[in-house]
Regions:
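N-terminal Lys/Arg-rich, disordered targeting/topogenic segments
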Residues: 1-18
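Hydrophobic membrane-insertion alpha-helices, especially the h-region
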Residues: 18-39
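Alpha-helical transmembrane signal-anchor/signal-peptide segments
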Residues: 40-61
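Catalytic nucleophile-elbow at a beta strand-turn-alpha helix junction centered on a G-D-S/GDSL motif
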Residues: 63-81, 309-312
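Membrane-embedded segments
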Residues: 72, 76-159
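Conserved, well-ordered alpha-helix/loop/beta-strand core segments that scaffold catalytic motifs
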Residues: 122-134, 193-294
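Secreted/periplasmic serine-hydrolase-like ester/acetyl group-modifying domain
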Residues: 140-248, 336-365
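C-terminal regions of proteins
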Residues: 268, 272-346, 350-365
Length: 365
């Protein structure tokens, strides 16, 4: 008679359990290390490149109160429009979702992200970034996207924004990108790794109190371009922004800030294309360059970098001027009779003037 030999697993149940626990522990450690170290190694953007803090500061603001107007765009919005002044002068609630060289797809996803939390009455988009049809630099992507809360919107924004040398996984696990910052760490990196950082902006407005006059006597000839056609990709994202606003019942307003520095020249040919797009789609478009005198801008006192961008004194003038347009033409309501909004915004106005006083003391000659 043949006998069948049966092999019995003699590994004790306790040993198998310990092995399973070790595997689970290893996985937890693998996941915990990035979670613990990434907040330490990620740039804090508190003293240098403050623009990198702008994206994340929005969430605390919208948790307090919603906004009737969102400004979207590059430095021509976050250094030009002051929500505290809009409130003080007109009772308009607003926020600036801008960033350094914020390209059109960045702005589209900034808007889509904001609409997860609120539905403003109007979105004001600055059109200068329409000149760009491709991702530019990783550092600008990082400043725009690292502070965005995780969602499908952020995932799509990363894919749309990455340069050829970037990888999606580096955004999921920032430790992979910033591991070499060990030698650059400061006390702020440890102090603010897991706690709230001080605000660098006033509702998205990044203040500049310095004064460096523009050379108004100098003549310059803009660089001639081979092709003045605005890139198709940029216009596609502008149209996506328009459709998104339309779906949510939001008015989209296009603007060009009044600065027109030689290095960042706004060509008439570009302006004509934007005006034609606005006309074809029933949008308001304000090119504020010709309105500089009416706004009251004096580029001997209202710029901090020789005419490229406005300082706080120029931004206050522009905000008061454009606030009148928002009130009179676009019927954005005065919310100063709203008790909750008034309390929140009075704190923001006070914080704005406190920052202005402190910064003026630092920049006095």
């Amino acid at each position: 008679m043949e006998h069948t030999t049966v092999t019995v697993n003699k590994t004790p149940a306790r040993t198998r359990l310990l092995r399973a626990l070790c595997v689970v522990l290893a996985i937890l450690i693998f996941l915990a290390v990035p979670a613990v170290l990434s907040p330490v190694l990620e740039p804090k953007y508190l003293t240098q490149s403050k623009e990198g803090s702008l994206t994340e500061e929005y969430y605390a603001s919208v948790a307090e109160t919603t906004h009737d107007v969102l400004f979207i765009g590059d430095c021509e919005v976050f250094e030009s429009f002051i929500p505290a002044i809009l409130w003080e002068e007109y009772g308009i609630t607003s926020y600036v979702r801008g960033g350094a060289q914020q390209l059109v797809w960045h702005s589209y996803y900034m808007l889509a992200d904001a609409l997860r939390y609120e539905t403003p009455k109007a979105v004001v988009f600055n059109v200068y970034a329409l000149k760009y049809g491709e991702p530019q630099k990783e550092e600008y992507n990082r400043m725009a996207l690292d502070g965005m809360e995780w969602s499908s919107v952020k995932a799509e924004a990363i894919r749309a924004s990455m340069t050829r040398d970037e990888y999606f996984i580096d955004y999921v696990f920032p430790l992979l990108r910033f591991h070499s910052r060990w030698s650059e760490l400061t006390w702020d990196d440890l102090r603010y790794a897991y706690g709230d950082k001080p605000l660098v902006s006033d509702s998205g407005y990044l203040m500049q109190t310095g004064i460096l006059p523009a050379d108004t006597q100098a003549e310059f000839t803009p660089e001639l371009l081979i092709d003045y056609t605005l890139p198709a990709t940029a216009m596609e994202y502008l149209d996506k922004m328009r459709r998104l606003c339309e779906e949510r019942g939001i008015e989209l307003i296009l603007i060009k800030a009044p600065t027109n520095f030689w290095r960042y020249h706004w060509y008439d040919e570009w302006d004509e294309q934007v005006a034609a797009y606005a006309d074809a789609n029933g949008l308001a478009y304000y090119n504020l360059i010709p309105e500089a005198s009416e706004i009251g801008l004096d580029m001997s006192t209202d710029t901090y970098d020789a005419g490229a961008h406005l300082n706080v004194y120029g931004a206050e003038k522009l905000t008061r001027y454009f606030g009148g347009i928002l009130r009179d033409t676009h019927e954005i309501p005065d919310q100063r009779t709203s008790g909750n909004a008034s309390a929140v915004w009075q704190e923001r106005v006070n914080a704005y003037y406190d920052r202005k006083t402190a910064m003026e003391a630092e920049t006095k000659p």
